[in-house]
Swiss-Prot record:
This is 1-deoxy-D-xylulose-5-phosphate synthase. Pfam families: DXP_synthase_N (PF13292), Transket_pyr (PF02779), Transketolase_C (PF02780). GO terms for biological process: 1-deoxy-D-xylulose 5-phosphate biosynthetic process; isopentenyl diphosphate biosynthetic process, methylerythritol 4-phosphate pathway; terpenoid biosynthetic process; thiamine biosynthetic process. The lineage of its organism: Bacteria, Pseudomonadati, Pseudomonadota, Gammaproteobacteria, Chromatiales. The gene is dxs. Transmembrane segments: none annotated. Mg(2+) binds at D151, N180. Its EC number is 2.2.1.7. It catalyses: D-glyceraldehyde 3-phosphate + pyruvate + H(+) = 1-deoxy-D-xylulose 5-phosphate + CO2. It comes from Nitrosococcus oceani (strain ATCC 19707 / BCRC 17464 / JCM 30415 / NCIMB 11848 / C-107). Its cofactor is Mg(2+); thiamine diphosphate.
Length: 640
C-alpha cells in the first residue's frame, strides 16, 4: 500500500453531512485516502488497526446513505470504529486515541453525538439498536437504526436473543453482519450480489409482501410451498435461513469492499422497513498486506514503522515477566503434571496467555468464543465429572458470567480455578476494560477463595494453591509486568488465608493487597510503617488484622479495586465484628469509572503509586483526632 502524502478529499470532511455532498464518483478516492491516513496515524500512536482497515468502505457507505446522527449507527465492540471517528469530526485528534485526555478507544456517548451507544464489550449492538428502534416507533419518529456487528460478536448468545426479539416485534431495524473470517468465490459472489440487489429492491419487497397477503388466504400447503421455494432459491447462494427463521429479511453476502455495491444495496435497504440483515464479507487489515496476512498481530498495535511492519524478533532481556506470562508458564507446567487439567477461555487466547498451552495440549484447550456465561458453566460441568478446569478470563469479562459463577460453580462448591487477568487499573482501553470491581463482586460469594499476588513468583504459587483446592478459587492479577521477583520452578501451596509480614515498623500498619504491596513498601520506608502482604482477600487473615490493630495507632488498607465492598471493607468488617476500634484509612480506586491513559498515569492519578500512598497517609494522620477512632475512605481525593 503506497503512502499518500496528502489527503485533499479527506481533509474536506469534517462531518458526515459534508461527506454526503461529495459526488459518488469521489468515494473510491476518499476510501484510499482514509485507509492510508488510518494506517499511518495508528502506526504512529498505537491502537486498534486491522479491524478499522476492514471497514473503510462500509463506514463511508453508511454515513453517505444514512442521515447520521439523526439516523442511529450502533457499532459492536468498537475496534472497527476508527474510520467512523475520522469521518465524524475527529480526524485531527485520532493520534491521541487511548491516551490520557485524548480520544476514547471505543465509541463513547460522552465524546460525540455520532457515537450513539458506548461500547467496548462484545455483542451488545443489536440489543441497543433494537431499543433505539422501539424508542423511535413509540415517539413517532421516522429515523433509521443500524447495528453493525462482526462475525465474532455473533458467537455470543446475547446477539441471538436480540435478533429473536427484533424479529418477533417486526422492528424497523437493519443489522449489518461484518463477516471478516470467510471468503466467497467470484462466481458465488457475483450471483449472490445480484440476488441481494434484487431482493433488496422496492419492487421485490412490494411483490413479496403482497404475495404474502394473498397466500395467507389460501390453504396452508400452498403458503408453505411458496415459502420453501423462496428459501430454496436463496439458500443456494446465501446462508441466511437462520435469520429468516428469526423474522429477518436476509440479504447477501456481498463484497464489503465494493463501494458501489454497498451504496446501491444500502440505498435500497434504507427504503425498506422491518427487520433486515445485510451480510457483508470483508478482509481484516484490507489494503495493508502485512495486516491482511496476520490480522491477529495487527489487531492492537504499539507504534511501528508501516514500511517494515511489526518486528517479531527476539525480545530484549528483561528481569521481569508479565503476570500473563507467569500464568502461561504455570498452566503448561501444571498440565504436564496433571492430565486432568483443562484450559478454557472465552476468545482471549492471546490476551490471556493460552497460546503455548493450546499448542502443547490442543486436546485439553477449549476456546468457547465470546461466550463468557457458557465458559463458566462448561467449567462447572467438567468439574462435576472429575476434570480440573482453569478458566482464563479478563476481570471485566468475568462480570458477564456472574450468575454462572454463583449459581453453577460456587453454590455447588465445584473446584474451578479462575485466572483473572487485567485486574485493577488496566490503562489505554479505558473504562470498559478496567478491572475495578472484581474484589467487590467476588468476595461476597460463599465457598470462593480469592487471592491477589504481590509479585510474579507469588502469582505462580497462588495458581498452584488454587488448583489444589477442592473448591472454587480465583487468582486476580494486573496487566503488565510485576516488580521483578524471580519465578521459582518449584510450586508450593500457600497456607490458606494467611498473610505475610513484609516489614516491621511503628505506629502505622499498611495492609496491602496484590499489586499495591510494592508501592506500599516503598512508601513505608518514609513512614517507618509496618507492611503486610495480605495475599488472601477471602478468607481474610483475621488473626493478623487484629494483631496489627492492637499494636498500631493507625491501620491503612491499600487495594487496586473500588473501596465499596472491596478488600478494605473486609478489614473494616472484621474489626467491627470483633469490637476493635482503631483509626482505619481505606485507600483504593475512586467511585467513578477510570478513563483511558497509561497504567502508570492512572495509578498516579488514583494515588496508588508510592508517592500517592505516602501523601494519603500523611494527610490523614495529620488531621487524625488524637482521642477518637475513625474510619476514613480515601480514593483519589474522595473521602467518605
Amino acid at each position: 500500500m503506497a503512502s499518500v502524502t496528502s489527503y485533499p478529499l479527506l481533509e474536506q470532511i469534517d462531518s458526515p453531512e459534508r461527506l454526503r455532498r461529495l459526488p459518488e464518483s469521489d468515494l473510491e478516492t476518499l476510501a484510499e485516502e482514509l485507509r492510508d491516513f488510518l494506517l499511518h496515524s495508528v502506526a504512529r500512536s498505537g491502537g486498534h488497526l486491522a479491524a478499522g482497515l476492514g471497514t473503510i468502505e462500509l463506514t463511508i457507505a453508511l454515513h453517505y446513505i444514512f442521515a447520521t446522527p439523526e439516523d442511529r449507527l450502533v457499532w459492536d465492540v468498537g475496534h472497527q470504529a476508527y474510520p467512523h471517528k475520522v469521518l465524524t469530526g475527529r480526524r485531527e485528534r485520532l493520534g491521541t486515541i487511548r491516551q490520557a485526555g485524548g480520544l476514547a478507544p471505543f465509541p463513547s456517548r460522552h465524546e460525540s453525538p455520532y457515537d450513539t451507544f458506548g461500547v467496548g464489550h462484545s455483542s451488545t449492538s443489536i440489543s441497543a439498536a433494537l431499543g433505539m428502534a422501539i424508542a423511535a416507533n413509540e415517539k413517532g419518529e421516522k429515523r433509521k437504526t443500524v447495528a453493525i456487528i462482526g462475525d465474532g460478536g455473533m458467537t455470543a448468545g446475547m446477539a441471538y436473543e436480540a435478533l429473536d426479539h427484533a424479529g418477533a416485534l417486526g422492528a424497523d431495524l437493519l443489522v449489518i453482519l461484518n463477516d471478516n473470517e470467510m471468503s466467497i468465490s467470484p462466481n458465488v459472489g457475483a450471483i449472490s450480489s445480484y440476488l441481494t440487489r434484487l431482493l433488496s429492491g422496492r419492487v421485490y419487497s412490494t411483490v413479496r409482501e403482497g404475495s404474502k397477503k394473498v397466500l395467507e388466504r389460501m390453504p396452508p400447503p400452498m403458503w408453505e410451498l411458496a415459502r420453501r421455494t423462496e428459501e430454496h432459491v436463496k439458500g443456494m447462494v446465501a446462508p441466511g435461513t437462520l435469520f429468516e427463521e428469526m423474522g429477518f429479511n436476509y440479504f447477501g453476502p456481498i463484497d464489503g469492499h465494493d463501494l458501489s455495491s454497498l451504496i446501491r444495496t444500502l440505498r435500497n435497504l434504507h427504503k425498506l422497513t422491518g427487520p433486515r440483515l445485510l451480510h457483508i464479507v470483508t478482509c481484516k487489515g484490507k489494503g495493508y498486506t502485512l495486516a491482511e496476512e496476520n490480522p491477529v498481530t495487527y489487531h492492537g498495535v504499539t507504534p511501528f514503522d508501516p514500511k517494515v511492519g511489526i518486528q517479531q524478533g527476539p525480545q530484549k532481556p528483561s528481569s521481569a515477566m508479565s503476570y500473563t506470562q507467569v500464568f502461561s508458564q504455570w498452566l503448561c507446567d501444571m498440565a504436564a503434571q496433571d492430565g486432568l487439567l483443562v484450559g478454557i477461555t472465552p476468545a482471549m487466547r492471546e490476551g490471556s496467555g493460552l497460546v503455548k498451552f493450546s499448542e502443547c495440549f490442543p486436546e485439553r484447550y477449549f476456546d468457547v468464543a465470546i461466550a463468557e456465561q457458557h465458559s463458566v458453566t462448561l467449567a462447572a460441568g467438567m468439574a462435576c465429572d472429575g476434570l480440573k478446569p482453569v478458566v482464563a478470563i479478563y476481570s471485566t469479562f468475568l462480570q458477564r458470567a456472574y450468575d454462572q459463577l454463583i449459581h453453577d460453580v460456587a453454590l455447588q462448591n465445584l473446584p474451578v480455578l479462575f485466572a483473572i487477568d487485567r485486574a485493577g487499573v488496566v490503562g489505554p482501553d479505558g473504562p470498559t476494560h478496567a478491572g475495578s470491581f472484581d474484589l467487590t463482586y467476588l468476595r461476597c460469594i460463599p465457598n470462593l477463595v480469592v487471592m491477589a499476588p504481590a509479585d510474579e513468583n507469588e502469582c505462580r504459587q497462588m495458581l498452584y494453591t488454587g488448583f489444589l483446592l477442592n473448591q472454587p478459587a480465583a487468582v486476580r492479577y494486573p496487566r503488565g509486568k510485576g516488580p521483578g521477583v524471580a519465578v521459582e520452578a518449584s510450586m508450593t501451596a500457600l497456607p490458606l488465608g494467611k498473610a505475610e509480614l513484609k516489614r516491621k515498623g511503628r505506629g502505622i500498619a499498611i495492609l496491602a493487597f496484590g499489586a499495591t504491596v510494592a508501592p506500599a513498601l516503598e512508601a513505608a520506608e518514609k513512614l517507618d510503617a509496618t507492611v503486610v502482604n495480605m495475599r488472601f482477600v477471602k478468607p481474610l487473615d483475621e488473626d493478623l488484622v487484629l494483631e496489627m490493630a492492637m499494636n498500631h495507632e493507625l491501620l491503612v488498607t491499600v487495594e487496586d479495586n473500588v473501596i465499596a465492598g472491596g478488600a478494605g471493607s473486609a478489614v473494616s468488617e472484621c474489626l467491627a465484628y470483633h469490637g476493635v476500634s482503631v483509626p482505619l484509612l481505606l485507600h483504593g480506586l475512586p467511585d467513578n469509572f477510570l478513563e483511558h491513559g497509561s497504567r502508570e498515569a492512572l495509578l498516579e492519578q488514583c494515588h496508588l503509586n508510592a508517592e500517592g500512598i505516602l501523601q494519603r497517609v500523611k494527610t490523614y494522620r495529620a488531621r487524625l483526632p488524637k482521642s477518637k477512632a475513625s474510619v476514613v475512605s480515601s480514593a483519589a481525593g474522595t473521602h467518605g
